[in-house]
Each structure stands twice: as structure tokens, then as C-alpha cells.
Amino acid sequence: MLDVNSSYSYLLWCRDFAATSVVARDESGTAAAFATGYIRPEQPGTLVIWQIAVDGKRRGRGLGGAMLDHLTGRLRSRGVLQRMETTISAENEASQRLFHSFAARHGASVEHEPLFPARLFPDAHESEHLYRIGPLAESPTPTPGTQYSETRRTRSVAS
């Protein structure tokens, strides 16, 4: 389940973390998916994926994987990426498959461990596990069937 944040926080994210985030749009310009991330200050070679979401009717087509591949490719071309981290709840099998598949395409191992137990969250939130993926291979196996086209600071994806 995706934690929904305020529109203000997403606007700040777009302004301050555009280099480590991506929005996929369909032919009409409607947002189809997004991934938000940041570089860990104490580990400058590590991209943390904070959120990733794909519109329900577009799931299962490789869009999430294509966005992750695009982000890592963008950062690797700048020489600033060796690893990826994210947090996933134990019940979120779709995200677990997404990140394991990403690791396989990038020739990387996956390690995970408990990070935030449910008791630390003020609402009914599941515990979160930290997934560490890396080191990332130089030339990943591409995600089939998804193509990007440049649209200013976002990316477009055919639905």
C-alpha cells in the first residue's frame, strides 16, 4: 500500500529531487506511474527509492522496472551510482518481485533485514524491511517492451 503524502510534499519533491525521480506519462500526457528517490547523504553511491507507483490498469507491463532502469541509467551515466535501497513491507509481494527482478537485470545481489517495526508508526502501518541491492552491473539487461521519450524533466511511456 502506497503512503499518500500531501500535494505540497510532492511539489517539493519534484523541485528538489527531480534528478532522482521520474514520472511516466501516456500519449495524452496523463501520469501513468512515478518513482521518487534520493541519494543517501552518508552513502553518495546509493539511490534510495522512496516511493514507486503504477496506475492500476497499467500494472504488469514492466513500467515499474523500466522506471527503475531509467533512473539508475541516468545516475550511472553521471558516475554516481553503485547501489540501490528501498523499504518494503513483508506483505507487499509485488514490490518484492519488482526489486528482485531489477536486481537480476542488473547482476546485483539483494539483502534485506527489518528496519522499522510496526510499533514505530503512529497509524496502522506494517513493519518495513530495508532492501539493499548491489553492486549494480555496468550493462543491465533491458526491460522489454517499454520505451521512453524525452519530455522536459519527465519521461513519457506509451500505454
Q: What does each of the following model-derived ranges do?
A:
Residues 75-90:
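Conserved GNAT acetyl-CoA-binding A-motif
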Residues 65, 90-112, 122:
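Conserved active-site alpha-helix within GNAT-family acetyltransferase domains
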Residues 106-159:
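C-terminal "cap" of GNAT-fold acetyltransferases
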Residues 40-49, 59, 78-82:
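A conserved beta-turn-beta hairpin within the catalytic core of GNAT-like acetyltransferases
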Residues 54, 60-74, 97-101:
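Conserved acetyl-CoA-binding loop-helix of GNAT-fold acetyltransferases
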Residues 51-59, 88-89:
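A short, internal acetyl-CoA/4′-phosphopantetheine-binding micro-motif in the GNAT/acyltransferase core
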Residues 1-27, 31, 36:
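Active-site rim helix/loop that mediates acceptor-substrate recognition in acyltransferases
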